[in-house]
């Protein structure tokens, strides 16, 4: 999976700032090379490098396609079967495994070469290797739980909570100065070592940001496209062989017995998604699954096979923030073969990730009643409903593998970045804007 935008590891001018640019660029590559009016006129005139014969044109077209692929293949997310060039060896220390994974039940870190074709990557879990790591990865939700296991200099000599908090948290005036003094007295980071802040929750569910000291981290790793290491919950990539009827988990339309499904794990009446659900259910039947609210248990066949029996899936995020589209869209809807009904960031933001005809957005309708009327219309008009699946002929869905993929992408970022120093001056201002 490729980070996008201004990220250090992406310096090619061909690379897009958003995933949508990748699939749009792929869709237009043939037109730029072979189908433009200018190219056809040049061919008729016998211009430079374009033979007049049909066989010559075919050869020229293949050559043009190959050259374009060489120049701009970086636009597309690297596929699991791609063969990257050998990279310099890099060690990344996982200071915490997310959500308390460190301990007797934790699994060993992945082999990035086998999983993602990222060679030269060594993931470390032994904190004694702190001094040899080129990058140290911190998971925010674990970072803000408390100070006992913070890294040097905050964990080297000062062992009281009060002293450690003064070093890591900017809760009072002079904390940054004291942290810098601690760097001098208890040992600094190895030269060039990056501290990477990792978080995949929305700003609404990311406590403790305002307390973190300024200039503590060098890089950010998140779902945000403007992160230093951009790892979305999923993305689309071009099929190697476009198909009229691509195979997938979703059953044939005749087997879709239900209309609208929603799987929800946390129920909060104050959330926008719950309020909208109450309005929607007055006008159309919604089957709710999960352990929260009015949900019924997910059947034994599993979540994906359950959702696959429905025409629509409510991909309602727990909060609405830029770029925050999660497994509710990529896994629960797209992978299951249901049309997603989205409540999250605005439509324009979603269209930065997926084709506009692949989803329905609640903002497209003045009320929940009008959305319900449209869903019932699509239920009766099969041809119109099927249009929401046309994109599947050309694109497939990649689901991010947590947490292996973000870890390995950190290795790739270190390998391909330069040595220019950088720090995040105010993490809260960046993430909460």
UniProtKB/Swiss-Prot annotation:
It is an enzyme of class 2 (transferase). It is a single-pass type II membrane protein. The keyword Ribonucleoprotein does not apply. Residues 1-54 are cytoplasmic. It catalyses: a beta-D-galactosyl-(1->4)-N-acetyl-beta-D-glucosaminyl derivative + GDP-beta-L-fucose = a beta-D-galactosyl-(1->4)-[alpha-L-fucosyl-(1->3)]-N-acetyl-beta-D-glucosaminyl derivative + GDP + H(+); an N-acetyl-alpha-neuraminyl-(2->3)-beta-D-galactosyl-(1->4)-N-acetyl-beta-D-glucosaminyl derivative + GDP-beta-L-fucose = an alpha-Neu5Ac-(2->3)-beta-D-Gal-(1->4)-[alpha-L-Fuc-(1->3)]-beta-D-GlcNAc derivative + GDP + H(+); an alpha-Neu5Ac-(2->3)-beta-D-Gal-(1->4)-beta-D-GlcNAc-(1->3)-beta-D-Gal-(1->4)-beta-D-GlcNAc derivative + GDP-beta-L-fucose = an alpha-Neu5Ac-(2->3)-beta-D-Gal-(1->4)-beta-D-GlcNAc-(1->3)-beta-D-Gal-(1->4)-[alpha-L-Fuc-(1->3)]-beta-D-GlcNAc derivative + GDP + H(+); an alpha-Neu5Ac-(2->3)-beta-D-Gal-(1->4)-beta-D-GlcNAc6S derivative + GDP-beta-L-fucose = an alpha-Neu5Ac-(2->3)-beta-D-Gal-(1->4)-[alpha-L-Fuc-(1->3)]-beta-D-GlcNAc6S derivative + GDP + H(+). In adult, highest expression in spleen, testis, brain, lung, kidney and skeletal muscle and to a lesser extent in liver and heart. Residues 1-20 are annotated as: Disordered. Keywords: Glycoprotein, Glycosyltransferase, Golgi apparatus, Inflammatory response, Membrane, Signal-anchor, Transferase, Transmembrane, Transmembrane helix. Residues 75-433 are lumenal. It holds the Pfam family Glyco_transf_10. One of its GO terms (cellular component) is cell periphery. Its EC number is 2.4.1.152. One of its GO terms (biological process) is positive regulation of leukocyte tethering or rolling. Belongs to the glycosyltransferase 10 family. Catalyzes alpha(1->3) linkage of fucosyl moiety transferred from GDP-beta-L-fucose to N-acetyl glucosamine (GlcNAc) within type 2 lactosamine (LacNAc, Gal-beta(1->4)GlcNAc) glycan attached to N- or O-linked glycoproteins. Robustly fucosylates nonsialylated distal LacNAc unit of the polylactosamine chain to form Lewis X antigen (CD15), a glycan determinant known to mediate important cellular functions in development and immunity. This is Alpha-(1,3)-fucosyltransferase 4. It comes from Rattus norvegicus (Rat).
């Amino acid at each position: 999976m490729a980070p996008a935008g201004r990220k250090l590891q992406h310096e090619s001018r061909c690379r897009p700032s958003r995933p949508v640019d990748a699939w749009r660029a792929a869709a237009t590559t043939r037109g730029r090379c072979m189908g433009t009016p200018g190219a056809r006129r040049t061919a008729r005139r016998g211009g430079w490098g374009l033979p007049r014969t049909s066989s010559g044109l075919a050869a020229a077209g293949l050559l043009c396609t190959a050259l374009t692929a060489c120049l701009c293949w970086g636009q597309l997310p690297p596929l699991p079967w791609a063969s990257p060039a050998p990279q310099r060896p890099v060690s990344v220390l996982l200071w915490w495994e997310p959500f308390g994974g460190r301990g007797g039940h934790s699994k060993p870190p992945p082999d990035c070469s086998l999983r993602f074709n990222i060679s030269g990557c060594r993931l470390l879990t032994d904190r004694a290797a702190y001094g040899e790591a080129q990058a140290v990865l911190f998971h925010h939700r674990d970072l803000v739980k408390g100070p006992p296991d913070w890294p040097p200099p905050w964990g080297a000599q000062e062992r009281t909570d009060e002293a450690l908090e003064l070093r890591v948290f900017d809760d009072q005036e002079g904390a940054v100065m004291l942290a810098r003094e601690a760097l001098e007295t208890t040992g600094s980071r190895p030269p060039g070592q990056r501290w990477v802040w990792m978080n995949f929750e929305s700003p609404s569910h990311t406590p403790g940001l305002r307390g973190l000291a300024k200039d503590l981290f060098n890089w950010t790793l998140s779902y945000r496209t403007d992160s230093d290491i951009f790892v979305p919950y999923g993305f689309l990539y071009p099929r190697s062989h476009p198909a009229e009827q691509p195979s997938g988990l979703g059953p044939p339309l005749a087997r879709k017995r239900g209309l609208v499904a929603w799987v929800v794990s946390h129920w909060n009446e104050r959330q926008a998604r719950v309020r909208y659900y109450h309005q929607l259910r007055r006008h159309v039947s919604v089957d709710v699954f999960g352990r929260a609210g009015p949900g019924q248990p997910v059947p034994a066949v599993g979540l994906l096979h359950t959702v696959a029996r429905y025409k629509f899936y409510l991909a309602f995020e727990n909060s609405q923030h830029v770029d925050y589209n999660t497994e509710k869209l990529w896994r629960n809807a797209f992978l299951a073969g249901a049309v997603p009904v989205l409540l999250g960031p605005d439509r324009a933001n979603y269209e930065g990730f997926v084709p506009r005809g692949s989803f329905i957005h609640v903002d497209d309708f003045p009320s929940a009643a009008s959305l319900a009327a449209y869903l019932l219309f699509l239920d009766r008009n099969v041809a119109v409903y099927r249009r929401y699946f046309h994109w599947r002929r050309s694109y497939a869905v990649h689901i991010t593998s947590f947490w292996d993929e973000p870890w390995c992408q950190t290795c790739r970022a270190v390998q391909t970045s330069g040595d220019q120093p950088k720090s995040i001056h105010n993490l809260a201002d960046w993430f909460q804007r």
